[in-house]
């Protein structure tokens, strides 16, 4: 069993879209809350603008409603991506590498901080250098190597995990030498015991990961199919994959890094 703490949550109430939970508090219906929630869920997941993930978590499929503000935001991101790509391609290779090193270093520090792993700028810098020279002896070098693969400016696209074993392999890479003994996966590939996430400010339990391991494997098999589903726009697919993976929480520790 493991218990994790949650950091600050991103607010999403600046948009007109209302969550199902919020919708329940807005009406004065005498219908049972569970029945109203289920009816609202069915209406949304079967809507014309809904992208369905195929990932079922505790009896309900993960979905995204492509509402007006989200569609506009995605268009803005695509436009900005074109501008950024043009500017990026105009930079000398040395400048690109220097910028990527700084960007990846900052991201690794942030990710480690969220995961509760202590790291310094010097350690991250050494890890990036080791990753570029295939020196696996440095702390975080395997983690850095994965980030560098994502940032390479060649045309090679990093392979998306295709099997449950691939997920475990990536996990082993990014957590190498950083896990406590009682945080090591104790199942076939993933954890076999429960894991909890608590709010650090209130101590309130806000999430329990999927269990047992057999159910984790079922959910992650669906997740692998979602990751390769080209019928869903890439940004929406990435958001659904991120949510579903963290919800499943297949490991006691290191889920965010994976």
Residue ranges and their predicted role:
Residues 1-258:
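FIC/Doc superfamily catalytic core
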């Amino acid at each position: 069993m493991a218990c994790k703490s949650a950091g600050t949550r991103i607010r999403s109430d600046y948009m007109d879209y209302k969550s199902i939970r919020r919708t329940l508090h807005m009406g004065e219906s005498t219908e049972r809350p569970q029945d109203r929630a289920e009816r609202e869920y069915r209406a949304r997941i079967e809507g014309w603008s809904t992208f369905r993930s195929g990932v079922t978590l505790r009896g309900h499929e993960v979905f995204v409603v492509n509402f007006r503000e989200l569609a506009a935001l995605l268009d803005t991101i695509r436009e900005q991506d074109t501008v950024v790509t043009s500017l990026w391609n105009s930079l000398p290779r040395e400048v690109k590498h220097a910028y990527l090193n700084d960007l990846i270093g900052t991201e690794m520090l942030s990710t480690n901080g969220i995961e509760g792993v202590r790291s310094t700028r010097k350690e991250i810098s050494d890890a990036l250098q080791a990753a570029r020279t295939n020196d696996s002896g440095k702390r975080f070098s395997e983690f850095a190597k994965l980030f560098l693969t994502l940032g390479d400016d060649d045309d090679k696209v990093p392979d998306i995990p295709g099997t449950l074993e691939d997920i475990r392999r990536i996990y082993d890479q990014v957590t190498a030498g950083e896990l406590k003994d009682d945080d090591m996966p104790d199942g076939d590939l993933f954890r076999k015991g429960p894991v909890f996430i608590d709010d650090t400010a209130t101590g309130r339990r806000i999430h329990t990961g999927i269990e047992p391991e057999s159910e984790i494997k079922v959910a992650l098999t669906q997740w692998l199919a979602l990751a390769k589903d080209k019928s869903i726009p890439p940004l929406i697919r990435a958001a659904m994959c991120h949510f579903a993976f963290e919800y499943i929480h297949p490991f006691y520790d290191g889920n965010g890094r994976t």
